[in-house]
Amino acid sequence: MVKRIDPHTHSAYSDGTDTPAQLLAIAAQAGLDAIALTDHDTTTGWDEASAAVTHTGVSLIRGAEMSCSSSGITVHLLAYLFDPASPGLVDNFRRTREDRETRAVRMVENLSADYPITWEDVLAFAPEGGPVGRPHIADALVAAGAFPDRSAAFVQALHPSGPYYVHYWAPDPVEAVRCVRQAGGVLVLAHPRARKRQRLLPESVIADMAAAGLFGIERDHRDHAPEDRLDVERMAREMGLAMFGSSDYHGAGKPNRIGENTTDPQVIAEVIAQGSIEVIEP
């Protein structure tokens, strides 16, 4: 059985800085038995990550972090072991990526009035053919000397409450839960109490997601203070949700260390049992 798993990591195919192969190698060095690759709204990195399993000895749970929106509040869902060819899911991912890029162009236009940044600067940090979003804008701002790191750029310039922010289309989280469940996937609500980065989702919406088939909720996350973790634990008990811990690792530019939080192997075993595709084993 998998002993140490970090079920929330990102590669350069979305907003991380490591290739999927590098990501698995870093996981091996950190003593992890498995990771889940959860790039934003894409499965592009799955094949490369799968090819790295044998020589790294790290098992791979294939997933994605699905962007959603509820009354203007950004919601992130970790989706695991779903059919990547499911038409509804493919369409949601495509539409979200396209609208996010349109939004990014508008945000750069807003920012350029106060910061030395162009769209070409942002594209230099984005994966070729991959999604372009706020992390790549943050990297361009850091490169321009406007902020010391990604985290500072997010808090001071790219926060949803700030003057430069532009909303983009994303599916309703309850509908997204139903969509991923139809694709055979297992869903976990990511960092629901990350107060510095987002407005908080009302508990009533989380309850509706649980009723629609949400499996778990992320408790142990760097952006959750001790009191937030206790609050998530309470919600998990009341709503019958499994509790997860993860790093939300992105590589360089963010302090998150791979494996700094992990998830109980019995919880992961249930994810594997419910998923519709297999885990890639060494």
Question: At which residue positions do the language-model features occur?
Answer:
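Polar low-complexity intrinsically disordered regions
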Residues: 1, 281-282
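A short acidic, helix-capping loop that chelates divalent metal ions and anchors anionic groups
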Residues: 88, 254-255
